[in-house]
Amino acid sequence: MKSRYLKQIKRKITEFDPSRANKYFLFGSFVRGEKYHDIDLGVIGNEKSRKNLSELEDVFYDSTIPYKVDIVDFDGAEKDFKHHVFKKEPLLWIR
């Protein structure tokens, strides 16, 4: 089941950002393989392209993925939070 959602996530990101302006990765319970209630999607990129992240939220809201996709702008995230995620969480890079 996880791989099916992963394929959908990759497809949605490719459609949303065909120029590959940002880097995308998954973290949190989805990646750890725990029973999850949401999917955490981290985004790193340039400021101009990050301004459209609310549009990306809409893309996932309208998708058939049965979990809420929380989009986290890692360029604007707290330093301690980024440290925790990058040092202690398993990451699954989308691109």
Language model features by range: what are they?
Residues 1-26, 31-37, 44-95:
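Catalytic core of pol beta-like nucleotidyltransferases
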